């Protein structure tokens, strides 16, 4: 028998997906977000949020395990906020999205 362990893939837990989808459903209903995608890798998981169907993700919630569970919110490779708490990252996203209108 082969006793080699398969590498564990990082994923979002059920309650984490629920928290993200709760906000996602609100944002999609007001037309701010259009779609999402989820990626799972050995060292991280990403919930990507798309504001347009033509372009790549506008926002990414990334979960990784370096020392502990850690969440990062980024937009176009710029880190907006990071925390050990998913709730803090989601609260950052709850702020209204403001656009300058001329």
Question: What residue spans do the PLM features occupy?
Answer:
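Mixed-charge, Lys/Arg-enriched low-complexity segments
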Residues: 1-8, 78-102
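Short aromatic-glycine-(Arg/Gly/Cys) micro-motifs in beta-strand/loop hairpins
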Residues: 2-3, 54-78, 95
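Amphipathic, interaction-prone secondary-structure segments
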Residues: 32-60
């Amino acid at each position: 028998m082969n006793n080699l362990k398969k590498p564990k893939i990082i994923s979002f837990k059920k309650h984490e997906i629920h928290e993200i989808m709760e906000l996602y459903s609100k944002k999609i209903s007001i037309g701010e977000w259009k779609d999402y995608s989820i990626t799972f890798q050995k060292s991280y998981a990403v919930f990507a949020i798309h504001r347009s169907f033509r372009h790549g993700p506008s926002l990414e919630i990334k979960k990784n395990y370096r020392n502990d569970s850690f969440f990062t919110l980024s937009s176009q490779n710029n880190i907006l906020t990071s925390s050990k708490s998913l709730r803090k990252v989601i609260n950052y996203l709850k702020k209204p999205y403001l656009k300058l209108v001329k």
